[in-house]
């Protein structure tokens, strides 16, 4: 059974355009409700969280209508980070968790992703089954079995208290000046409060959401504002989250960025030294830098690569019994603490390393030298398949021959946008540029 509606991170699109319409959200809620509440079952509960996008109100109400129509009882969390939904689904014994967010995308976009009762994102197979239900006639509940919906006020507080329990016992952040950029998104209240309660001097950025400014010139995809704040306030470190707070970028005391690869390298090395890194293995995607793989290998550790998408990282971690993984983009997954990427928890672990070692952020955030990497995106029109064009395939084969033994080439379709991503790594930067430019030109011609 294949998926057509779901991408690598749920269902996404432009708000009020298929598939992100109120009508589709209602039907999707009903299909998910029927999947998680078979006909004749009791009245299981579902938690729904959202980020701060304007369209979140519309989709929240439509999903609620669909879910209650099949007999699900809905608990509305309001704006909370994506990982909070995973946590609260388990904590509140819900049969289903739903997050309304398009993560790092602009406010015009939105998305819907589902979590199972274990707090993990649904498998491809489960999503395909929901799509199959969606394609048919969805049987509603009997009038007396329609679900109820209510807003709960303590969901965010529960998550914040849990976050603090993941911080080393007895350790405090007193004396640390921390810039936290919440991208005008879901963590705009949770993240600053947790840091302050742990003792940090907090300088908040991106904490004034208005429905249209999520990820706008702020957050993990635009860390310049946080970098300016770090320098202006003489902060020790900056933590940049994205709109739903499931990814993080660290800024050192000069405002220089450290991506997910550098964060994972630090955690892997520390956890290995402490005997906490299971089987000496870190799980990361095919996008992670070759330098990370070499760094781990030099320490007798192993890198397990997966397809792009934090859900595939998590699936590999669960299969292998590993407890640390993530993506270069800043999804850091620590299954000892969470069921999905959690930017705030990863930020806390970085701060713990600073507090325990007394070292500067710049010393901790540069574990390895990256191999030069070049990534370019090429947009294509709906219905086109540029990677199947003979001319494109010929250029790719030639590039693979030229890079053989000297670097790495990765070309893939985005799972969330109509983009072809062309990425290459090579110590020879001239060869690197030539290879990427030739492939990009061929893809553009075919698109």
Curated annotation (Swiss-Prot):
It catalyses: alpha-D-glucosamine 1-phosphate = D-glucosamine 6-phosphate. InterPro entries: A-D-PHexomutase_a/b/a-I, A-D-PHexomutase_a/b/a-I/II/III, A-D-PHexomutase_a/b/a-II, A-D-PHexomutase_a/b/a-III, A-D-PHexomutase_C, A-D-PHexomutase_C_sf, A-D-PHexomutase_CS, Alpha-D-phosphohexomutase_SF. The modification Phosphoserine is found at residue 103. Mg(2+) binds at residues 103, 242, 244, 246. The keyword Metal-binding applies. GO terms for biological process: carbohydrate metabolic process; peptidoglycan biosynthetic process; UDP-N-acetylglucosamine biosynthetic process. Its cofactor is Mg(2+). The active site is at 103 (phosphoserine intermediate). GO terms for molecular function: magnesium ion binding; phosphoglucosamine mutase activity; phosphomannomutase activity. This is Phosphoglucosamine mutase. The lineage of its organism: Bacteria, Pseudomonadati, Pseudomonadota, Alphaproteobacteria, Rhodobacterales. The gene is glmM.
